[in-house]
Structure formats: structure tokens, C-alpha cells
């Protein structure tokens, strides 16, 4: 990949991120709402997945890799399974046991 192609790809990615954040994301909690213990949205949900899901990969690099992947596209992992996790854990009540049920499909284990 040439330098100009790489630059164009990065610029388009940043433009997409700005457009998405300026129109709002329905899967992140408003700043005016108080966080519940069992309701998690966006980065909070990714953090819960990192803590709850077992991994066969190296422990040192896996959480940071998962967080970086999610931050690239505002909860990319949450969009993979048809917003089912968002419905269970962001919009509604979600227990840790229920969230553990999504580990295999989300992390490809």
C-alpha cells in the first residue's frame, strides 16, 4: 500500500468517525444519566467483556487489543451480533452470567 493510499484511508476513517459521533450513537449512554451496576453501554460494556470473558490468548496483550478494536469504531464488537448485546446489557438489565454467554461468539473462541 502506498503512502498516499494509506493517508487517504486514515482520512476517510477519521471522517467517518466524526460523522458518526456528530449524529450521535444510540448505543452509548447520555452524559446526564447515572450509570447502573448492571446496565453497560459502549466502552463500559467492552470493559465488562474483557473482565468476564476467558481467553486462550496471551493475557498481557488481549485486553488492550480488544479495547483498541472497540475504540476504532465505537463499540465495534457490540454491532457484530445484530445489536443483541446492546439490547440485553445497555437498554435492559444484564447479569454477568448472561454477558458470559456472548463471550464465545464475540471473541471467536
UniProtKB/Swiss-Prot annotation:
One term under GO cellular component: extracellular region
Record localization: Secreted
Taxonomy, superkingdom: Eukaryota
Signal peptide range in chain numbering: 1-24
One example of a Gene Ontology biological process annotation: glucose metabolic process
Tissue expression summary: Expressed by the venom gland.
Function summary: This venom insulin, from a fish-hunting cone snail, facilitates prey capture by rapidly inducing hypoglycemic shock. It is one of the smallest known insulin found in nature and lacks the C-terminal segment of the B chain that, in human insulin, mediates engagement of the insulin receptor (INSR) and assembly of the hormone's hexameric storage form. Despite lacking this segment, it both binds and activates human insulin receptor (long isoform (HIR-B)) with a moderate potency (EC(50)=373.2 nM).
Name assigned to this protein: Con-Ins K2
Species whose genome carries this gene: Conus kinoshitai
Amino acid at each position: 500500500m502506498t503512502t498516499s493510499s494509506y493517508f487517504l484511508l486514515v482520512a476517510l476513517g477519521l471522517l467517518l468517525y466524526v460523522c458518526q459521533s456528530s449524529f450521535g450513537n444510540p448505543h452509548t449512554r447520555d452524559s446526564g444519566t447515572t450509570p447502573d451496576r448492571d446496565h453497560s453501554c459502549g466502552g463500559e460494556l467492552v470493559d465488562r467483556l474483557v473482565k468476564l470473558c476467558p481467553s486462550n490468548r496471551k493475557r498481557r496483550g488481549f485486553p488492550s487489543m480488544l479495547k483498541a478494536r472497540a475504540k476504532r469504531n465505537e463499540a465495534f464488537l457490540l454491532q457484530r451480533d445484530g445489536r443483541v448485546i446492546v439490547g440485553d446489557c445497555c437498554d435492559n438489565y444484564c447479569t454477568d452470567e448472561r454477558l458470559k454467554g456472548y463471550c464465545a461468539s464475540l471473541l471467536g473462541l
